[in-house]
């Protein structure tokens, strides 16, 4: 779940230029540490803005290849007031074999990226993106980046299907926005074989890894590669 108002805090600040220093206020995005538990045991902590905990957790487990589908999950327990999510797998033995380092840098990949572990990705032969559509989608993404427009402190990504934005997520970390969209798609049972991710963030190798393993064939970024 998302709570726009609770994600933004207004703080007193000092604004300085070459002539003066004045007291004013600024809207800033909150930062919380999400505790992700697997079968009741701590798995990792993810720095985030405090929204869509269930999607973020499921998307992260997918990108780490801890799960392949929603069918592997028995129960999702979210305690928003404690910034905690507990994912209970049907295979209880699996959690004892897993170690993921803490993610202080907002959802970055928990392991070093090994291209040998990338899942097969088949791009439809007739898959294409028209330049004008790409530009229009990016313009829409920027217009709908409400948290960024208020605070200038978030990244924003969106899932596009059939030329339309079907889901949009903002967070302090660009990695988190991808995991949220991945979690959303998994929970909604979306076919991502012809989907597109558009994002305001730089496309690092970790972003490519996450998008690739979701089965999404294309990324469009507003930033440098």
Residue ranges: model-predicted function:
Residues 144-190, 196:
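Histidine/lysine/aspartate-rich catalytic loop segments that bind and position anionic ligands
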Residues 1-161, 167:
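Intrinsically disordered, low-complexity regions enriched in acidic/Ser/Thr/Pro/Gln residues
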């Amino acid at each position: 779940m998302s709570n726009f108002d609770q994600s933004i805090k207004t703080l007193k600040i000092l604004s300085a230029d070459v002539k003066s220093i004045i007291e004013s206020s600024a809207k800033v995005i909150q930062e919380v540490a999400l505790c992700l538990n697997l079968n009741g045991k701590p798995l990792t902590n993810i720095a985030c803005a405090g929204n869509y905990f269930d999607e973020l957790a499921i998307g992260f487990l997918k990108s780490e290849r801890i799960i392949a589908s929603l069918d592997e999950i028995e129960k999702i327990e979210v305690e928003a007031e404690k910034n905690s999510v507990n994912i209970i797998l049907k295979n209880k033995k699996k959690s004892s074999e897993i170690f993921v380092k803490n993610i202080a840098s907002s959802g970055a990949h928990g392991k070093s990226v090994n291209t040998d572990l990338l899942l097969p990705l088949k791009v439809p032969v007739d898959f294409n993106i028209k330049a004008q559509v790409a530009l229009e989608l990016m313009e829409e993404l920027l217009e709908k980046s409400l948290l960024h427009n208020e605070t200038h402190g978030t990244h924003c990504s969106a899932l596009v299907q059939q030329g339309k934005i079907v889901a949009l997520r903002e967070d302090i970390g660009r990695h988190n926005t991808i995991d949220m969209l991945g979690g959303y798609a998994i929970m909604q049972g979306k076919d991502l074989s012809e989907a597109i991710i558009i994002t305001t963030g730089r496309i690092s190798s970790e972003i490519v890894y996450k998008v690739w393993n979701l089965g999404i064939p294309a990324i469009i970024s507003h930033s440098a590669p």
